[in-house]
Amino acid sequence: KHRFILYVTISTGIGSALILDGNPIPGPHNPEGGRILLKTPAERFEKIASGTAIRHRYGRIAAQIRSRRVWREISEEIALGLYDLILATDPEIVILGGGVAVHYKKFIKEVRSAMQRNRPFYTLPPIKQAQYTEHAPLLGAMLLADDTARHHAQNTH
């Protein structure tokens, strides 16, 4: 349905991938979306919004957080990084996966509000939760292994 997708995993760290027509777009330097600088080198996206950052700041993992105030704070941090990734890549849709994204419903309204409030002159693409939120990396690795095996089998016969 969508040709150009930005996938962002928010888990222990933060990673991202661009997908065009169902295929990941490899880059020559293997950058990670979580390494973008938000304000200073100490404030990289994954240093303030990853599962590790959440556990470090609040003393508990995302699954244990019930406070709306805390989720608003987390949402502000997620919004900062997502906005910059969206501006840099201009995707049709953003898909969120990973252990923190399992809690999508707890933070997505606040993320959208923060993005609109802080950067109101840009139309945001839809931001959706991945279907297999926590298992996407494993499924992707399995599909890649299968594709590699098929390619190898075709080229050796």
Residue ranges and their predicted role:
Residues 25-33, 111-120:
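Acidic-glycine-rich active-site phosphate/pyrophosphate-binding loop
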Residues 141:
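Binuclear metal-ion centers of metallo-dependent hydrolases, dominated by the metallo-beta-lactamase
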Residues 55, 146-149:
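Short amphipathic alpha-helical signal-transduction/dimerization elements
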Residues 1-2, 26, 112-113, 145-146:
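Short, hinge-like loop/turn segments at secondary-structure boundaries
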Residues 1-86, 153:
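Glycine/GP-enriched mid-protein hinge/lid loop-to-helix segment characteristic of carbohydrate kinases
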Residues 44-112, 119-138:
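Adenine-nucleotide phosphate-binding core of ATP-dependent small-molecule kinases
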Residues 148-157:
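Acidic, glycine/GT-rich loop-and beta-edge segments that sit at the periphery of enzyme/chaperone cores
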Residues 60, 144-147:
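Residues within well-ordered alpha-helical secondary structure of globular protein domains
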